[in-house]
Amino acid sequence: MENSDVTDALDEAGRSFERSPENVEEGLDVEEAELVQLRRACRLLAAASRLLDDGYYTVVIESSFVAIERTIQFRLVHDGAMSASEVISSHRRLYQRGAEIGLYGDAFGERLAELWNQNRTKTYYRLGIATEAQAESMRELATQIHADLVGASRVKHECLC
C-alpha cells in the first residue's frame, strides 16, 4: 500500500496488540475460557440490540449467528465436551457437537446449520439484502438459545445479559 496514512495505521494497530493491556473491556476480564465465550455472547446480543435500533440489519444478523455459536461453545467447554484450546472452524461441525452432547436434538442442530448455510452467507456477501424482520427474528433466536443454554448451566449467574 502506497498511502503512508494507511501503513502508519497498520503499524499502530499491530503495536496496540503488543502493549500491556490498559482500559480493558469490563466484564470480559475472566480467567475461565468458558466464561469468556459466555460473556462474548452476552456482548454480541447487547450489540445486536443496539444496532437493530439503528437499522444495521446485516450486522445484527451476523452478531446473532456469532452469539449463538459463542453460547454453544460456552456449553461445550463448560460441560467438558471441548477443551478451551480446541478450535472448531466449521460452523456445521459446531452445531453438530452441540447436538452430540445433548444441548438440543440432531434435527435442531441441522436446522441451525442450514439456517447459517442458506442465510448468513447470503446476507454477509450481499447476495440478498437484510431486512428488519430478518434481523429481529435472528436476534430473538439468538436470545432464546442463549437464555436456554445458559439457564441450564451451573454458572448462569455469570451471564451479563
Q: Where in the sequence are the language-model features?
A:
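Terminal alpha-helical segments
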Residues: 1-161
